[in-house]
């Protein structure tokens, strides 16, 4: 499947990544992307920036190297109440919010606890996508959570770094299960490289292979085109980004 948007990338600001936004944009162009989301870790992760970093993304250009830039964050799931570690005052300056479990922030518990947290994250209305759900340390009820995500128009990320098999070990088979259940339920999928170095921005080959193998229709993959991604943001109630009118109307 052709994928023209990468919705999960990091810069050196995350504390354990190694490239600048400009370097990421250059790689995005070289790798054939039309658009990518810059989504550094929110502040509860060790080494991550203060929330001002995300609020100030309003100064970023809408295009770098001819590639559209979406202003985002990978927030942390903080508790079972559905809280993330970004103040609500920052929301107006962001286009895209991922929420993910990370072991340094949320101590792994049992499936019921993780399921409750994910359901409340979905229902809080602030989160556009759930990140790298395959992690076996954070088991959850796939069908219940994915059904809720469908009902609330929250995208399910398939993460290319996870599919390499050396990060969040034990996730690969679970990602296939999530993709199959998501396909059957009709969820929206998004695709992220989870790049921590610029050369990986736009590297979505394993995700593409998985989606083809499972038989997911491109109409349910919001990153199949930049137009589909922007349409999904509007479906979620986000204000259209004027600088992308030409993309939207292409």
Swiss-Prot record:
The keyword Metal-binding applies. Zn(2+) 3 binds at residues 74, 102, 132. One of its GO terms (cellular component) is cytosol. Zn(2+) 1 binds at residues 8, 10, 74, 194. Binds 3 Zn(2+) ions per subunit. One of its GO terms (biological process) is bacterial-type flagellum-dependent swarming motility. Transmembrane segments: none annotated. It is an enzyme of class 3 (hydrolase). Belongs to the PHP family. Zn(2+) 2 binds at residues 16, 41, 196. Its EC number is 3.1.3.-. One of its GO terms (molecular function) is phosphatase activity. HAMAP family: YcdX_phosphat. Keywords: Hydrolase, Metal-binding, Zinc. CDD domains: PHP_HisPPase_Ycdx_like (cd07437). This is Probable phosphatase VIBHAR_04983. Its cofactor is Zn(2+). Pfam families: PHP. It comes from the Bacteria.
């Amino acid at each position: 499947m052709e994928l023209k948007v990468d919705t999960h990338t990091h810069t050196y600001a995350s504390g354990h990544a190694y490239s600048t936004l400009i370097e990421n944009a250059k790689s995005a162009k070289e790798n054939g992307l039309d658009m990518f989301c810059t989504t550094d870790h929110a502040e509860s992760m060790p080494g991550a920036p203060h929330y001002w970093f995300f609020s100030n993304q309003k100064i970023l250009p809408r295009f770098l190297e001819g590639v559209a830039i979406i202003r985002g964050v990978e927030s942390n799931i903080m508790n079972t109440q559905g809280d993330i570690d970004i103040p609500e005052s920052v929301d107006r300056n962001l286009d895209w919010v991922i929420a993910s479990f990370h072991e340094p922030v949320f101590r792994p518990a049992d499936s019921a606890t993780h399921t409750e947290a994910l359901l409340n994250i979905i229902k809080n209305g602030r989160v556009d996508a759930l990140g790298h759900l395959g992690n076996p340390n954070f088991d959850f009820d796939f069908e219940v959570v994915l059904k809720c995500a469908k009902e609330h128009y929250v995208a399910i990320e398939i993460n290319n770094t996870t599919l390499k098999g050396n990060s969040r070990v034990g996730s690969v088979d679970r990602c296939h299960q999530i993709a199959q259940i998501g396909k059957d339920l009709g969820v929206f999928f998004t695709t992220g490289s989870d790049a921590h170095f610029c050369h990986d921005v736009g590297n979505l080959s394993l995700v593409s292979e998985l989606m083809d193998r499972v038989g997911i229709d491109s109409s349910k993959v919001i990153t199949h085109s930049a137009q589909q991604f922007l349409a999904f943001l509007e479906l979620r109630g986000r204000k259209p980004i004027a600088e992308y009118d030409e993309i939207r109307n292409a």
